[in-house]
Regions:
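Histidine-centered nuclease catalytic patch
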Residues: 29-67, 73-90
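Short, well-ordered helical secondary-structure segments
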Residues: 2, 27-31, 63-65, 69, ...
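A boundary/linker detector
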Residues: 1-13, 37, 131-168
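A generic structural signal for ordered alpha-helices
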Residues: 8-11, 21, 44, 59-60, ...
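Charged/polar, solvent-exposed surface patches and flexible loops
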Residues: 3, 17, 21, 80-84, ...
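A generic signature of intrinsically disordered, low-complexity regions enriched in glycine/proline
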Residues: 45, 122, 150-152
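Domain-exit/linker segments immediately C-terminal to small folded modules
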Residues: 70-144
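Short, charged surface segments at domain edges that flank catalytic/cofactor-binding sites
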Residues: 1-29, 50-51, 97-99, 103-108
Length: 168
């Protein structure tokens, strides 16, 4: 799925501007909870219901995050998730300055909202439908290959056991 979603590498100036808006020029931390940042999270999800949402990997859709928050948030709406009782969400972890963090993220989105692209309109319906037909076919081939692999494992295990029994 991610193979069709473009990645736009940010410039140093764009990263600096993003960190400035988020109040992190001196110390980069998780935008959601304040813990040590270990990665960049897509503020708006790239994929939902096994389809691209239209958002891409660009600096305006990325914020510093810790692994706990990134994994817990997944592809949920960031604001709803922050205020939710989902495991490891800022609210469920008792983050004291949650409303300040929300305000900074809202300002970040106001200053440079993530770009949303209608993928099908951009590439045309023929290519789009062809891609998804190939995708469906590939998933079916992977399912069949997995069945074959299971059968191979079973037969090799049986051959192994037969050889061990013959040796005793």
């Amino acid at each position: 799925m991610n193979g069709i979603i473009p990645v736009v590498p940010p410039t140093e100036a764009e990263v600096r501007a993003a960190l400035e808006t988020l109040g992190m020029l001196d110390r980069v931390s998780c935008s959601y909870c304040g813990d040590t940042s270990t990665e960049w999270d897509h503020l708006r999800p790239l994929v939902s219901n096994q389809r691209p949402t239209g958002y891409i990997s660009e600096i305006h859709n990325l914020v510093p995050a810790c692994g706990k928050c990134n994994q817990s948030k997944g592809n949920k709406d960031w604001l709803t998730w922050m205020r939710s009782t989902a495991p490891l969400s800022p609210r469920s972890r008792g983050v004291a300055d949650i409303e300040d963090r929300i305000a900074r993220l809202q300002e970040y989105e106001r200053q440079a909202s993530p770009t949303r692209v209608d993928f099908e309109a951009a590439v045309g319906p023929d290519l789009w439908q062809r891609h998804w037909a190939h995708h469906k076919h590939l998933l079916e081939l992977m399912r069949l290959a997995d069945q074959d692999a299971q059968e191979i494992r079973t037969r090799v295990r049986e051959a192994h056991e037969a050889k061990r029994q013959a040796a005793t």
